[in-house]
Amino acid sequence: MKPTLTFIHSPDPLYADNQNYGVEFMPLWVFNLSSNLNNKENYNITLYDSRIHKIDNMVESDIFIFSGIDQDLHMINSVQENLRTRYPLSKFIIGGPITWSFHKAKSLYLLKEFDQIIIGDGEDIISEVIENNLNNK
């Protein structure tokens, strides 16, 4: 059976409504990262977008991959906590602008519940990160 990778897009709705004037942006980071996976045909790849899907309908995944901006922290942590409780054997990875800025602000401890934090261009290392997590390295 193919391993399942679930990309999680969970923007803070208040920030999106007030700062983005209600404009909902497609999570292009998911397509960018998944297109950089080696042997992507060996995975079941899904996208969860909290603006569309209900968290209670999410199914188990081998790896949940998150990204976001600083303002999404509350939503990201809420979704991650819910999924970790339901799927304790899954791996949880986070990257994107939130990790870079938290690293610069010495605030990475706010993401301590994740199994792996990626800082920098995930496109270059996504395949290695996925394989290492699937092989418990």
List the predicted regions and their residue ranges.
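Glycine- and acidic-residue-enriched helix-capping/strand-helix junction motifs
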Residues: 14-30
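Short polar catalytic/cofactor-binding loops
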Residues: 7-14
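Glycine-rich beta-alpha loop elements in corrinoid/cobalamin-binding modules
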Residues: 34-137
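Extreme N-terminal starter segment of soluble prokaryotic enzymes
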Residues: 1-5
